[in-house]
Design a protein with these regions (language model features):
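Conserved SAM/AdoMet-binding glycine-rich loop
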Residues: 77-81, 86-88, 187-261
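Proteins enriched for Cys/Gly/acidic motifs involved in redox and nucleic-acid/cofactor modification
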Residues: 3-203, 257
Length: 261
């Protein structure tokens, strides 16, 4: 405990640390949060970017909250992510939690600029959100792969799945923004990029001319020849079409797919 106390003293006035739980989209968003906290000099917080896909995932959220407070008692804990969005009251009642922030709000720089003056829950109706944020991430610390958000939310209402209530309705990132994001990462030395979202096979339905995921992949591979490997996160097998099978001949598209069943 003496060593832990000394470590805590040394860590005071250090950058806030981010704990990402759950999906690859959270990894991407965690880097966005990290960049916003660094830019606005937000220090001495532990920010837990949570998951709520299963009951076990929610148990892990509570475990991480308590562990973080025990190990770094001087740091205020901010909870965000799907668990925070779906059940903010549950977590704001935990003594260890200083602030609860919703899934859309966590990507809003204005929220982080005023975070030191905030002490109340900041969670709005996620179903009112119709656009994606347009952040550019330069690197993913400690990771060989880079993650690029192409889509948010889900229009399906599967009886077993709570995620639409954490992420809202499906909304897509415009192709030019995706190309810009990938170009930046490739120019910074990343050989592999993972396209991520909540329901990426629904990509483009809300954009002008409704480009689909497979048209996006072709555009990326044709526009960015320096990109060596492109990988997909989870895909809905019900939305796979002939364009998808034709894409498998592309050597730079990794032939490993996680199917949501």
């Amino acid at each position: 405990t003496k060593d832990l106390w000394k470590y805590n003293v040394k860590m005071k006035n250090k950058e806030s640390n981010i704990i990402n739980l759950g999906c690859r989209l959270n990894i991407y968003e965690g880097e966005v949060i990290k960049s916003l906290t660094k830019k606005n000099n937000i220090n001495n917080y532990t920010i837990i970017n949570s998951c709520a896909v299963t009951a076990e995932a929610e148990k892990k959220v509570c475990y991480e909250i308590r562990k973080s407070k025990k190990n770094f008692p001087f740091r205020k804990i901010i909870l965000t992510g799907c668990a925070a969005q779906i059940n903010p009251i549950k977590y704001e009642e935990m003594d260890e939690v200083h602030l609860v922030i919703g899934n859309n709000e966590k990507l809003d720089e204005k929220i982080w600029k005023n975070i030191n003056q905030s002490n109340a829950t900041i969670v709005d109706d996620i179903f009112k959100v119709s656009k994606t944020h347009r952040h550019l991430i330069e690197k993913f610390e400690g990771k060989a792969r880079a993650y690029v958000e192409i889509q948010q939310g889900c229009n399906h209402r599967c009886t077993f799945c709570v995620i639409p209530f954490g992420r809202g309705n499906s909304r897509s990132v415009p192709i030019n923004i995706i190309i810009e994001r990938i170009n930046l990462l490739v120019n910074n030395g990343y050989n592999e990029v993972v396209l991520t979202g909540v329901d990426i096979t629904d990509y483009g339905n809300d954009l002008p001319n409704s480009p689909n995921l497979f048209q996006l992949i072709k555009r990326i591979l044709n526009t960015i020849p320096k990109l060596k490997q492109l990988r997909l996160s989870s895909i809905d097998c019900g939305e796979i079409n002939d364009d998808f099978w034709n894409l498998l001949s592309e050597k730079r598209l990794m032939p490993h797919f996680h199917l949501s069943l």
